[in-house]
């Protein structure tokens, strides 16, 4: 019997609040981000799931989110694997810049293309396609085999690394994934079939606040 895959985007970070491109930079959660992570953990506790293993990125905002969730579900010592394959999209030269300042420097249209096109990367950075090119193989080799063995796996990561996974799981087109926004701290619970396709998906919270 196939297992369960739960995906959670980290809570709001300091740089989300300051409207900065974050990428592989490493700010922590805001007070609101901590609340969001705790709410996600509470939702999972009420759902009644117990995990076998967790995965997260090497960035503190995702790791902090995971810790708060695991505390809420009563599994603070759950085995956890941290890998940069699950890191946020690398924004390259945009990293650390205020989004309005970036628009002033490169023009609103160009920055919009970098942010919202599927395959055009910012200078020195990754496109969404590039992000998926490292996330998806990691999922196939490290995470999916555990789910197919019947394990319950939690992944706490980032907006774009998770969008790369959801694109394939939900069979979204390029246009569909570009329109997809994942709310911070809201768990998505996937039950997978033996052939690795999705049997069911349940969202434990409100995705309308996604950004």
From Swiss-Prot:
Subunit record text: Homodimer.
CDD domains for this protein: HP_PGM_like (cd07067)
GO biological processes: gluconeogenesis; glycolytic process
Gene that this sequence comes from: gpmA
Residues of the signal peptide: none
Protein EC: 5.4.2.11
Reaction(s) catalysed by this chain's protein: (2R)-2-phosphoglycerate = (2R)-3-phosphoglycerate
Protein name, per record: 2,3-bisphosphoglycerate-dependent phosphoglycerate mutase
Site for Transition state stabilizer, residues: 158
Source domain of life: Bacteria
Described purpose of this protein according to its UniProt entry: Catalyzes the interconversion of 2-phosphoglycerate and 3-phosphoglycerate.
Annotated substrate binding sites: 9-16, 22-23, 61, 88-91, 99, 115-116, 159-160
Pathway linked to the protein: Carbohydrate degradation; glycolysis; pyruvate from D-glyceraldehyde 3-phosphate: step 3/5
